[in-house]
Amino acid sequence: MKPYLDLMRHVLEHGTRKDDRTGTGTLSVFGWQTRYDLAAGFPLVTTKKCHLRSIVHELLWFLQGDTNIRYLKENGVSIWDEWADENGDLGPVYGHQWRSWPKADGGVIDQIAEAVKTLRTNPDSRRIIVSAWNVADLDRMALAPCHAFFQFYVAEGRLSCQLYQRSADIFLGVPFNIASYALLTLMMAQVTGLKPGDFVHTLGDAHLYVNHLEQAREQLSREPRPLPTMTLNPDVTDIFGFRFEDFTLGGYDPHPAIKAPVAV
């Protein structure tokens, strides 16, 4: 996870102090890219323990097109609690846009299903894209999409994914985002008969909140450990058919977790 740690170090040393929506304040840089070879291990941060259960359940929740936190709460995941209304609703956030992008004629587009179809029938297409950034729906979302837009790319039988993330909370959010999209790439590769390639992470406003700086320094003081492996149930051939028990993380030996407040 050297690319992630290099980003954190760079922002600590060269970031610009900025105000932000939450009123917390950040150190920020604009425009950064990291790359992770998914054949070299599963990119889950080892310099602190990450809660894989939350990552997996959130991704499955997105893929089901769900926008109510009930499923997450039932599975012990609280990462969306601060933004939900009294009924647990979040508005037309990620899952809605991924699975039910509204059309002008009143219909919807299932972007994930379309991506799978195109990967199977026209893998050289440069249009295998999923967007969560629906300008017309932003005002109805509890939180505008941070990881806004991703594209799949096939070369020599290997599937790569590039994510554009407009806003990147380096300490708390980015480790989740890396693992989530790496996992999605593994899943998409399996159901389309491809091998995993790279996950490319392109960041817009990459920032450390000022109340995360000491935690970031503590993390940078730790020696990275070998990356774990991620094994998927080979019997699953439908991207919407995965369940939590279909994922097995092996060899994960992280340093202890480091607590930090969430900026809401």
Swiss-Prot record:
Alphabetized Pfam families for the sequence: Thymidylat_synt
UniProt gene name: thyA
Record protein name field: Thymidylate synthase
CDD domains recorded: TS_Pyrimidine_HMase
UniProtKB keywords: Cytoplasm, Methyltransferase, Nucleotide biosynthesis, Transferase
GO cellular component assignments: cytosol
Annotated localization: Cytoplasm
EC numbers: 2.1.1.45
Catalytic activity field: dUMP + (6R)-5,10-methylene-5,6,7,8-tetrahydrofolate = 7,8-dihydrofolate + dTMP
Keyword Methyltransferase appears in the UniProt entry: yes
Methyltransferase keyword on record: yes
Family (UniProt): Belongs to the thymidylate synthase family. Bacterial-type ThyA subfamily.
InterPro entries, sorted: Thymidate_synth/dCMP_Mease, Thymidate_synth/dCMP_Mease_dom, Thymidate_synth/dCMP_Mease_sf, Thymidylate_synthase, Thymidylate_synthase_AS
Subunit and partners: Homodimer.
NCBIfam families with a match to the protein in the record: PRK01827.1-3 (NF002497), PRK01827.1-5 (NF002499), thym_sym (TIGR03284)
Cystine crosslinks: none
Residues annotated for dUMP binding in this entry: 21, 126-127, 166-169, 177, 207-209
Single GO MF annotation: thymidylate synthase activity
